[in-house]
């Protein structure tokens, strides 16, 4: 197995993606428990450092994956109209507080004149690669769009992400239910209002 062949679930078999130092994470979590006044050796917490290390290995698996590893399958389908995958569930981790944000991504593109497309599941995998790392939603949205532009060379790309951030829900301003919406448009979607509006109508279910 190479460092880029890690898949979600491998941690259950004791494997971890390249760059994840699980023993170091365990030591750090133990120190955090001590720092907040807890006893890391009591029942209920004694296995917590190891559990957190395994969870982090899964949550941050995208750090050792590259978009070219999933956008490898390209078909010559002679399809030149929009391709859109809606409601791709995503879970990520806010890099400011290391708490989750979650929601959905909508990813669309217009193939180039050669009609090259990729598998629909590849779009979901691409979202996962960038979601499974310390992130901010704005960068996540742009990274997905830029990766598609680079790998597929389509006429245009649109990515819209809607997410709820627990750093706003469970702490700070404490506004549960508030959602953040970000978008990234490239090529034809940036240049043509009509094309962009068509995509947004499809995303919002108006067509």
Curated annotation (Swiss-Prot):
GO molecular function: GTP binding; GTP cyclohydrolase I activity; zinc ion binding
Record keywords: GTP-binding, Hydrolase, Metal-binding, Nucleotide-binding, One-carbon metabolism, Zinc
Pathway note: Cofactor biosynthesis; 7,8-dihydroneopterin triphosphate biosynthesis; 7,8-dihydroneopterin triphosphate from GTP: step 1/1
Uppermost EC category: hydrolase
Binding site for Zn(2+): 94, 97, 167
GO biological-process terms attached to the record: one-carbon metabolic process; tetrahydrobiopterin biosynthetic process; tetrahydrofolate biosynthetic process
Stored SUPFAM superfamilies: Tetrahydrobiopterin biosynthesis enzymes-like
Pfam name, any one: GTP_cyclohydroI
Gene Ontology CC annotations of this record: cytoplasm
Catalytic activity as recorded in UniProt: GTP + H2O = 7,8-dihydroneopterin 3'-triphosphate + formate + H(+)
E.C. number(s) listed in UniProt: 3.5.4.16
Subunit structure: Toroid-shaped homodecamer, composed of two pentamers of five dimers.
Record family assignment: Belongs to the GTP cyclohydrolase I family.
UniProt name for this protein: GTP cyclohydrolase 1
Organism name: Thermobifida fusca (strain YX)
Lineage: Bacteria, Bacillati, Actinomycetota, Actinomycetes, Streptosporangiales
């Amino acid at each position: 197995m190479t460092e880029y062949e890690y898949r979600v679930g491998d941690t259950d078999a004791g494997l971890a993606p390249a760059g994840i130092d699980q023993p170091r994470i365990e030591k750090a979590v133990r120190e955090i428990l001590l720092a907040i006044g807890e006893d890391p050796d009591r029942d209920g917490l004694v296995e917590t450092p190891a559990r957190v290390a395994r969870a982090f290995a899964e949550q941050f698996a995208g750090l050792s994956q590259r978009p070219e590893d999933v956008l490898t399958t390209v078909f010559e389908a002679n399809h030149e109209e929009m391709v859109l995958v809606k409601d791709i569930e995503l879970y990520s981790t806010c890099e400011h507080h290391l708490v989750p944000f979650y929601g959905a991504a909508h990813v669309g593109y217009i193939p180039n004149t050669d009609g090259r497309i990729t598998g629909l599941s590849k779009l979901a995998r691409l979202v996962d690669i960038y979601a499974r790392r310390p992130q901010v939603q704005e960068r996540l949205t742009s990274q997905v769009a830029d990766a598609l532009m680079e790998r597929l060379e389509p006429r245009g790309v649109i990515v819209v992400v809607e997410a709820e951030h627990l750093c706003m829900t469970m702490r700070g301003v404490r506004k549960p239910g508030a959602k953040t919406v970000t978008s990234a448009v490239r090529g034809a979607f940036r240049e043509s209002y009509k094309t962009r509006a068509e995509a947004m109508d499809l995303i919002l279910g108006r067509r």
